[in-house]
């Protein structure tokens, strides 16, 4: 069975962990940006279907929020 010859240093471990976390953070930001563009109807590269029931309910919610202000 293959076993590493020497122990990995703390700094190398931290560097690898930071790279892994940065990749996860980047993909999360990309997904959040796509979600924001879809919600604000500014998406140009993402196609989706609109359900009439959801569309009508969202309009009533948005107008009720404006009335409360």
Curated annotation (Swiss-Prot):
One GO biological process term: translation
Return any one Pfam family short name: Ribosomal_L32p
Is Thylakoid among this UniProt entry's keywords?
Answer: no
Tell me where it resides.
Answer: Plastid, Chloroplast
Alphabetical GO CC annotations of the entry are:
chloroplast; large ribosomal subunit
Show the SUPFAM superfamilies listed in the entry.
Zn-binding ribosomal proteins
UniProt GO MF annotations: structural constituent of ribosome
- Matches recorded under HAMAP family: Ribosomal_bL32 (MF_00340)
- Please give the name of this protein: Large ribosomal subunit protein bL32c
């Amino acid at each position: 069975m293959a076993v590493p010859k020497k122990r990995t240093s703390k700094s190398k471990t931290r560097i690898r962990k930071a790279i892994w976390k940065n990749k996860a953070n980047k993909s999360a930001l990309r997904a959040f940006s796509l979600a924001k563009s879809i919600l604000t109807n500014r998406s140009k590269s993402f196609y989706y279907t609109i359900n009439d029931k959801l569309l009508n309910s969202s309009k009533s919610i948005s107008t009720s929020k404006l009335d409360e202000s």
